[in-house]
Structures are given as C-alpha cells and as structure tokens.
Regions:
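Acidic carboxylate diad motif detector
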Residues: 1-14, 159
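Positively charged, helix-rich recognition surfaces that bind polyanionic ligands
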Residues: 14-260
C-alpha cells in the first residue's frame, strides 16, 4: 500500500484554480526478466501510436488526438480574432489575453494531458495482462528538424506531445517492472517486412501507395503496423536477441478508442 508522505495545498493563482500536490512513497519494483514477449510502438501523425505484439497482433491507439487538437486550435483562433477586434475598437494600448482565451488554453492542455494518460494506461494494462516484459518504442529524436514534410505537416509534427508520451509511458511501465527501450527508427516505414534488414538498401518508398497503405506484391499491409514491426526488427538486430516475429496482424489492425 502506498504511504502518503506530504500534502501541499496551493491557493488560487491568477487563473483562479487551487492546486493540491500529494507526495507518496511507493515500493521499488524489480524489472521483470526478458521472456521473449515484446510490444513495439510506432509514433505517428494521424495514428499517434501503432503497436505490434510479437504474437502476431496489432492495434492503433490515439487516432482522436488530431481532431481534439484541431477543435481547440480552431476555437482559440476564433476567440483571439474576436478579442483582437474588441481591443482595436477600444483603442487599448495595454493588450491583454482575455479570461475566455486563458480558460480555453487551460482546457486544451488538461484535455490533452488526460488523453495521453488514458492512452499510456491502456498500453500498460495491455502489457500486464499479456505478460509483456519489454516495450520497444521508436525514437523520433530529431525527426522534426531533419525532415521537410511540407509546411502543414511540419506544423502538426511540432504540436505533437511526443516527449510527454515517452515520460508518461516510461513511469507507468516502470511501476509494473516493464522495461521501455527507445529504438532508432530510420527506414522503418519504408522497408518491406520480409526484407533481409531494415536499412536504406531495402527501402521501397513506392510500396507506400497512399497514406496508411503499404503494398508488397499483392499483399496489403497497414503502413504504420509495418513501421512498428520494423522497429522491433531493428531492436532485434542491435540486441542480438532471438525474437519470434510473425507478420500476421499487419494487414488487420484493430483500432482502440479512448474516451475524450
């Protein structure tokens, strides 16, 4: 049982909200031994997290994130425009942010934090239920600087909360004794699952016929599922561990909906 060590109560700040900080002690959890059961995760734009379970299952979680973010961004832009016209009409020299706008920013941030918490909790519970002791996640460090994917796509990438996902997932898994490993993921979305290795030598951009689809000969795969699969292949190559990796499930990916 967790032992509460300290409770701090902060009075309302400028936003009018009181905050309570609870500090509690938890027992150290020893890392589970590698049992050959893995989950790999490909972080994306439209599908925030695509997961491959090496028993031959795949699922997508986080598809609602972009629409959630778009809704608040659109509403914030609308209120900003209205407030700008009001300040101009009143000839206000000391420009301030409206309380309505502050409330919208706060609500957006809280909503996204809650959504990421629910996603990472689902993945943690999935690993515990299925006795997965190692999670391998694609390391997208530098991707937003190195790639020019167009103005709109780059704009969306810069707004994605990848650092928060890493942090939330890492601490939740650690509390269950599950290891989280970041794996460099270059060419993971371009190489066929049957290629000898995941590298520029076997990269086939033309196999991605359109967004979400990856075709090898006559077989149609989910492109993000292929990415998650290849991330685990890259980990297999650098770790030297023997990992069973059936391609079943790459064509039929289940979508997990998270309450917003």
């Amino acid at each position: 049982m967790d032992i509460i060590k300290q409770i701090k109560i902060y009075p309302p700040a400028n936003d009018g909200i009181s905050r309570i900080l609870v500090i509690y002690e938890v027992e150290d959890v020893l890392p589970e031994e590698d049992n050959g059961h893995y989950l790999s995760i490909d972080l994306g734009l439209h599908n925030l997290m695509t997961c491959y379970d090496n028993v031959g299952k795949t699922f997508i979680i986080g598809r609602e994130y972009l629409s959630l973010s778009y809704f608040y961004n659109k509403e914030i832009a609308r209120v900003q425009s209205q407030w700008g016209r009001i300040q101009a009409a009143r000839e206000m020299e000391d420009l301030k942010t409206s309380k309505h706008l502050q409330k919208l920013y706060r609500k957006k941030n809280d909503c996204i934090k809650d959504y990421i918490h629910k996603m990472t909790r689902y993945i943690t519970n999935y690993c515990v239920k299925n006795e997965i002791h190692t999670v391998v996640i694609g390391d997208i460090k530098g991707i937003r600087k190195e790639r020019n994917l167009g103005r709109k796509t780059n704009q969306k990438l810069h707004g994605l909360p990848y650092a928060r996902i890493y942090m939330q997932l890492e601490y939740k898994l650690k509390m269950k004794g599950i290891c989280l490993i970041r794996q460099e993921e270059s060419y993971s979305s371009q190489c066929p699952p049957q290629s000898e290795e995941v590298s520029h030598i076997y990269a086939e951009k033309r196999n991605r016929k359109k967004r979400g689809i990856y075709i090898v000969d006559t077989v149609i795969y989910n492109a993000d599922a292929v990415g998650a699969y290849n991330i685990l292949r890259k980990y297999h190559a650098v770790s030297g561990k023997k990992i069973d990796m059936p391609v079943t499930g790459l064509s039929s990916t289940k979508t997990i909906k998270v309450a917003v």
